[in-house]
Swiss-Prot record:
Its EC number is 2.7.4.9. It comes from Nitrosomonas eutropha (strain DSM 101675 / C91 / Nm57). One of its GO terms (cellular component) is cytosol. One of its GO terms (biological process) is dTDP biosynthetic process. The keyword Isomerase does not apply. This is Thymidylate kinase. SUPFAM superfamilies: P-loop containing nucleoside triphosphate hydrolases. The lineage of its organism: Bacteria, Pseudomonadati, Pseudomonadota, Betaproteobacteria, Nitrosomonadales. Phosphorylation of dTMP to form dTDP in both de novo and salvage pathways of dTTP synthesis. It is an enzyme of class 2 (transferase). InterPro entries: P-loop_NTPase (IPR027417), Thymidylate_kin-like_dom (IPR039430), Thymidylate_kinase (IPR018094). ATP binds at G11, I12, D13, G14, A15, G16, K17, S18.
């Protein structure tokens, strides 16, 4: 049995990840693949409890506490969902993964990258996504989308400056890991974003096929 592939979607709140993630899942299922859709934090019983705690706007917490809870949820996510699915040949698509910690806890909260790297190695033991699609949108557009969509959570209540730091951290990660992270302009129309994402996914798909991966 061939190991499956792990794809992550990243972006600040309001970037449109969820909409495009659903499309990609359908695209891959149409090709006969088993596809597991997950999210962070969450996707396990404990992870969903931690998600509620982390997003609760009534619950203030230290940046390091937030970081440790994120990585605790991630360890459960890996152990209970991601790794078992990949081992049986399924493809896993996650709404956020570790790049989000470097962006939100690192860029946004100011947690040093060195500490995040230690946690990343401890929790993931060298594991990383096969492909990451980062949907980049200006903070002004992000805020407009979030405010019109739902009641704000603890992160969404942060000021614009916080999200600008998060966005810049994401862009820096995209430069640092350009082979894995593909940037899509999320400020374009839905159709234009979809077209750009399809191009990214199809290139990845073709690369897997040419390397001998049996679809």
């Amino acid at each position: 049995m061939q190991r499956g592939k792990f794809i992550t979607f990243e972006g600040i709140d309001g970037a449109g990840k969820s909409t495009h993630l659903a499309w990609l899942a359908s695209f891959l299922r149409d090709k006969g693949l088993e596809v597991i859709v997950t999210r962070e934090p969450g996707s396990t019983a404990l992870g969903e409890q931690l998600r509620q705690l982390l997003l609760d706007h009534r619950q203030a917490m230290h940046a390091e506490t937030e970081t440790l809870l994120m990585f605790a949820a991630r360890r459960e996510h890996l152990d209970k969902v991601i790794l078992p699915a990949l081992e049986r040949g399924a493809w896993v698509i996650s709404d956020r993964f570790t790049d989000a910690s470097f962006a939100y806890q690192g860029g946004g909260r100011g947690v040093p990258s060195a500490r995040l790297e230690i946690l990343e190695q401890w929790v993931q033991k060298g594991f990383s996504p096969d492909l990451t699609v980062y949907f980049d949108v200006p903070v002004t557009i992000s805020r407009q989308r979030v405010q019109s969509a739902r009641t704000a959570d603890r992160f969404e209540l942060e000021p614009d400056l916080f999200f600008e730091r998060v966005r810049q951290a994401y862009l820096q990660r995209a430069k640092q890991f350009s082979e894995r992270i593909r940037v899509v302009d999320g400020s374009l129309s839905l159709e234009e974003v979809r077209t750009a994402m399809v191009e990214v996914v199809e290139k990845f798909w073709s690369a897997q096929a040419s390397s001998g991966y049996r679809m």
